[in-house]
Amino acid sequence: ALALKAYGTSIADDLASDKEAYNGEKMVAIYQKMKDMIDAGYWGDGILSTDFNTERNMLEAGKAAFTVDGTWNCGNFQNDSDTTLFDAQKIGVTRIPYIDEANKTVEMGGGSDTYYITTLNKSDEEIAATVKFIKYLTSVDSINEMCKSSPTTYAEKVTIDTGNYLLDDVNAIMAENTESKLEIPTYDSNTAAMDTIRNSLQALATGASAQEVGD
C-alpha cells in the first residue's frame, strides 16, 4: 500500500514488467520508511510474533491506537461476542496516509467474492447452469442478503441499510477512490514473488537494512 501511496498504481505494472526493480531506488525508499516506523516503535514490540488476535486485543484494551486490516473487519467488529466498542461507536476508519498527495485517493484493494467459470471437460448444460448460478450469486439481491450477515465491500453496491456505521464510512471513502490495485506482487508473472517479498520484508524487524531487504 505504501508504494501505491507514493508512486501511484503504475508502480505495480512497472515492477511486473521489470521497468522498476524490487531492489531499485523507489522500492528501497519504501522499505526504509517501513524500517523507520519499526525503529520508532510504531508497531510495538515483537511484531513478528504478534498475530491477529493479539492485535485486536491490544486495540480493544486501549493499548494500540489503530490496526491496519481489510474492510471485512467492519463485520467482525459487529459480529464479535464483545461488541462494546462497536456499539459505542468508538472505532473509526480512515485511509492509509498518502506519501505523495497526488495519490491521496489511490488505494490497495479489490472486489470480494470474485468467480470464474471453467469450460474444461464440461457439457453445454453444465456451463449454462454455472453461468446462471454465478449470475445469481453476484446479483444485487444475493449480495444484499450476504451483507446482512457479513457486512463488507462487494463487487456490487448493496441497496439496503447495513446497520454498520463502519461500512458506511468505508463506502464513503471508496466512493472517492480514483484508482486501486491489489497487492503489488499479484501482477508479477513469478508466482513465488508474493511469498518471497513477504518473507524478505520480515528481515526489517531483525535489523536488516532497506537495501539488504531489496537485494
Q: What kind of region is each of these model predictions?
A:
Residues 109, 149-155, 159-160, 170-215:
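C-terminal capping/gating helix-and-loop segments adjacent to ligand/active sites or protein-protein/ligand interfaces
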Residues 40, 82-149:
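Extracytoplasmic/periplasmic substrate-recognition and gating elements
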Residues 71-87:
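A ligand-binding cleft/hinge motif common to bilobed small-molecule-binding domains
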Residues 52, 69-74, 111-113:
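Beta->alpha turn/N-cap motifs
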Residues 1-23, 35, 64:
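Extracytoplasmic/periplasmic solute-binding protein
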Residues 61-70, 89:
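Alpha-to-beta junction loops
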Residues 17-48:
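Glycine-centered hinge/linker elements that transmit conformational signals in sensory
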Residues 46-60:
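Short helix-initiation/N-cap motifs at beta->coil->alpha
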